[in-house]
Amino acid sequence: MKLPKSLSSHCFYSKTTKLRLPYSSLIEDFKAAKARNLVTFQESRDECIKNAGIVVDAGTKANTPAEVKEAKSRLRVQELVGVPNKGKEGLGMRKRQYYSSSSTKQKRDMIVKTVREKEEECRVVKMTNFPNQGANLRWEVPQRQVKHNDIIKASDERLKFLIKSVYDLLPTPANKNRWFNTEEKCLLCGLDGTLAHILSGCKVALCLGRYKWRHDRVLKEIAGAVQAKVTENANKAENRRTRIQFVKEGQQRKEVNHEEEHFNHLSDAKDWKVTVDVGTSLKIPTEICITNLRPDMIIVSRKTKQIGIVELTVPNEDRIEVSGELKRSKYEQIAQEGRLNGWRVKIWAVEVGCRGFPAVSMSAFLKDIGYRGASKKKVIENLSKVTEEASLSLWKASHYKEWGGKG
């Protein structure tokens, strides 16, 4: 892929970074295998093997007895501390298997897992020493896992852009100033040309409509997914209304599972109309409220007096939560006025990072409209791909003052 040599190898093997690549560390696998062998001998049911004092030689790569001893100590300490919460988890969200009450096989697996966790901690510590390459650890977005099949299908240019943009290794003016001691600025506005500035913060690029162009491409992809689900729900409602089950003598009626059909916001009606603010001046219907705000998408059912307002933002990944709060507060008054007028109003503020990392709000939105499992995963993959390609085009255009590559 011709990645720069300054890219740390820990970025390829880390399991906690926001971009998880399908590679594993040979040293980590070697240490885990040696630890498994040693624990197998130490915890053997055969007393002769257990008391034989078999030594597992790991060479200069690892000190297996010390690592196994430290792993056991960690497991005992965790048993004394209890089950701590991680992130925004509530009480009782996770259960921990205790080392003292586990079987021999479970103890062996727990020790190997602890050895791997220690290696991951060392990688994270080393990555935090690099302020640019470790910045993605602070992003409030779900982890994105890249598989071997994705690497085979993706173009080399898009794959290199994804990896370099996540770890901030693109030759931006700010990086050139740090690498080569130059004094370059953003070509369009003359400010510091960091990657976040180029992809989502340049005011001149905003006035030229470059960010709007990327925004519309992502919005069209979301609108296509919403329209497909609206059509699917309408067909299901029609089939459910006309289907008659005939039961023969001696047989029982088969229960039909409509769980997914009832637990989404689009299953209550079949006259939904999807309108997108692309090339038109979209406005909220006046019978709901009178406002000058123009949402990105509205989903209206006049028979049931329901409306869904979708507001999309494509910010930098470290500003996703701030952007979501601003959008929700922006339309809160409209939601209150609509409810006073007898309408059921739902506000969806969704975000997709400029590098192609959909936020949690996007996953929640797709779940609300009826996407589950593989279908939701497919939509998220398409959104990531569209955003990556658009941001790659913006990155190329940042070297020129016009889209055509002139000037």
Per-segment meaning from a language model:
Residues 3-185, 387, 391-394:
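Extended C-terminal regions of large enzymes
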Residues 25, 177-229, 307:
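Short Cys/His-based metal-binding microdomains
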Residues 345-407:
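Domain-level recognition of nuclease-like catalytic cores that cleave nucleotide substrates
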